[in-house]
């Protein structure tokens, strides 16, 4: 126990530059990277802070085409400007994003259009 206390005392006496050099030496000796652990540990906190703010950009996601697939394809074409084949592939490959990075009002409007055509839509 006395040895551990001596190590703690020695580490506490290090300057910031000495501590950084010690970290580099330990990374080389043990073959690890402290930067990766810091990035992983910081990520959950950043996500929680972003979730607390009100979302301003939305992605309109086509969850399912429903019974009126042709009507949904027409709406997807009108919204996205895609060709017939691309719109058909998007509808048949649901769930897929139809439009990304739109504001709340536009997202709600697009959702209503697609639901009126018979699609099941999610906003993310």
Curated annotation (Swiss-Prot):
GO terms classed as biological process: translation
Keyword Ribonucleoprotein tagged: yes
Keywords: Ribonucleoprotein, Ribosomal protein
CDD domains hit by this protein: Ribosomal_L7_L12
Protein's UniProt name: Large ribosomal subunit protein bL12
GO cellular component: a single term: cytosolic large ribosomal subunit
HAMAP family with a match to the protein in the record: Ribosomal_bL12 (MF_00368)
Known partners and oligomeric status: Homodimer. Part of the ribosomal stalk of the 50S ribosomal subunit. Forms a multimeric L10(L12)X complex, where L10 forms an elongated spine to which 2 to 4 L12 dimers bind in a sequential fashion. Binds GTP-bound translation factors.
Sample GO molecular function, one term: structural constituent of ribosome
InterPro entries attached to this UniProt entry: Ribosomal_bL12, Ribosomal_bL12_C, Ribosomal_bL12_C/ClpS-like, Ribosomal_bL12_oligo, Ribosomal_bL12_oligo_N_sf
Record has Ribonucleoprotein as a keyword: yes
Gene: rplL
PANTHER family: 39S RIBOSOMAL PROTEIN L12, LARGE RIBOSOMAL SUBUNIT PROTEIN BL12M
Protein origin, superkingdom: Bacteria
Family in the record: Belongs to the bacterial ribosomal protein bL12 family.
Organism: Nitrobacter hamburgensis (strain DSM 10229 / NCIMB 13809 / X14)
Function, as annotated: Forms part of the ribosomal stalk which helps the ribosome interact with GTP-bound translation factors. Is thus essential for accurate translation.
């Amino acid at each position: 126990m006395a040895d551990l206390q001596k190590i703690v005392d020695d580490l506490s006496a290090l300057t910031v530059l000495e501590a950084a050099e010690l970290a580099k030496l330990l990374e080389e000796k043990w073959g690890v990277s402290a930067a990766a652990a810091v990035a992983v540990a910081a990520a959950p906190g950043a996500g929680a802070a972003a979730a607390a703010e009100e979302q301003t950009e939305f992605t309109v996601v086509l969850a399912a085409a429903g019974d009126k697939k042709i009507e949904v394809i027409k709406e997807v074409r009108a919204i996205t400007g895609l060709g017939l084949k691309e719109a058909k592939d998007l509808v048949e490959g649901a769930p897929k994003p139809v439009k990304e990075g739109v504001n709340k009002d536009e997202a709600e409007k697009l959702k209503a259009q697609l639901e009126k055509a018979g699609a099941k839509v999610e906003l993310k």
